[in-house]
């Protein structure tokens, strides 16, 4: 709204009304308008030790429906260029506008009662395909809570979907059919999801009962699948809209995930990738080797 100081067009966000309204200082032809470049009577005032100035003339402010200080739209409080872009979109094809940020949602909702409701479904769809962050993934979920989707991690990047499914079939004594499994793998991030197309409840419970388990904390249980020296950890995936190929590969991904894997491995009893060391001097194998060599020497002496 315009102020009571003559021809000024200053919004309440820049110049609040009330008892503490600051004193305005007038400078006749003190500035050049930002739009028309003509000189105009500018004003300045101070709020909380910050000085504000009018940077466009009242005529241009009235024409563009903007504040003389912040140049934002008077009604919606958004930048003028953003408002003009959205108006252009609305005029071209109002039904196709999808709000992409909070300002755009606010403007469309206030300026058109027809556009916003028509795009709610599209907006929800756009938000549903956002990138998942590592802290949102179900690394620490309870496998016993699995409804119909398993979450797999610590997968060797050289393994393929077919190889993992084959190992699952072996683990179920060939009772599980390949056509009944749906495994989505992200080799780069070493994660996957597993679902069953037929009898999902039955096969979910069967797999949980067959695979070896380990406990993380007092309440959380996980399963694991041994495969080519690699231990694939399995938990529950409780989110229906989770997509392994739509995960944000953050810089901290490796550090956070490796921390979880190392913790799991210590609970199971063997750290991942740990190799058997050489036998120490004085061990049984070492003594056995020495006795063999001594027998050979005695034979030669004879």
Swiss-Prot record:
Name of one Pfam family that matches: STL11_N
Chain spans, region Disordered: 268-302
GO MF terms held by the record: RNA binding
Predominant location category: nucleus
Subcellular location: Nucleus
Cellular component terms per the entry's GO annotation: spliceosomal complex
Ranges of compositional bias, category Basic residues: 290-302
Keyword set includes Nucleus: yes
Keywords from the named record: mRNA processing, mRNA splicing, Nucleus, RNA-binding, Spliceosome
GO biological process entries: mRNA processing; RNA splicing
Family as reported in the entry's similarity comment: Belongs to the SLT11 family.
Purpose of the protein: Involved in pre-mRNA splicing. Facilitates the cooperative formation of U2/U6 helix II in association with stem II in the spliceosome. Binds to RNA.
Subunit relationships: Associated with the spliceosome.
Protein name per Swiss-Prot or TrEMBL: Pre-mRNA-splicing factor SLT11
Organism: Kluyveromyces lactis (strain ATCC 8585 / CBS 2359 / DSM 70799 / NBRC 1267 / NRRL Y-1140 / WM37) (Yeast)
